[in-house]
Amino acid sequence: PFLRTKKKALKARFKQRKKWITALVLFVNFGILAALKYRNFAADNINLLFGTHFSSAKLLLPLGISFYTFQSMGYLIDVYRGKYAPDRNPFRFALFVSFFPQILQGPIGRYDRLASQLYGQKGFSLTRIERGLQLMLWGYFKKIVIADRAAVVVSEVFGNYQSYGGILVMAGVLCYSLQLYGDFSGGMDVIMGASECFGISLDTNFKRPYFAQSISDFWHRWHITLGTWMKDYVFYPFSLSKGMNKFGKYCKKHFGKHGGIYCSNRHFYVLLNQSLSHLPQRC
């Protein structure tokens, strides 16, 4: 009994230590990401509010830092949860995190779906390369022919909006929608095509969002892997936490049928985190 009790105590201590180490690593990595992306935004707003002349350090933002931070932290959380064993080979892990086609626009890969493709043997396939190059060509068409041409109209209309009437402003809005679509969809096609040439199938990240039938359906089609990352690593842990359960009971007790505030609060928290993952701008 004594040995069993001691073993349980050691196991509990190890579990607690693992929890704190995981939390520390998450805090440090997301803290670095926030500091790099928000330092100029914070300095500008402090100067605006208080009339100061504070200047932030001039640092270059590492290429793709958001994507490989989210991807590596998702891996860390999965290992902590025991979903799979950690890969102790640093070079294999570096390959998983920094696979070059997905650095700029994603998708945010999951270790269990991507690692086996990266580490396995790949044979030469002319058909696969042709398919990948065709997809890349289609992506460049969206970017160069659609997005860049629409950007000319957008820049002119919104750069000199005082000179244009309602119909032309509406045309500028429509062209901006085309520009966004061409930039993101075209970029994803190039990424998927380049990966296909290497025999790697990445997760779908963009699925005809302008054909969505509702706002919810739209968000399930646009930047899909970021949405699923937020769902798995933010929404569910946040929703099932003790604090949110207590808040839910409080809402039901004091608001009755209006306890939906609890549900909307969870979605607001996730959408806030999702918006903060992009570069901030002051309107």
Where are each of the predicted segments found?
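Membrane-embedded transmembrane alpha-helical bundles that form the catalytic cores
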Residues: 1-283
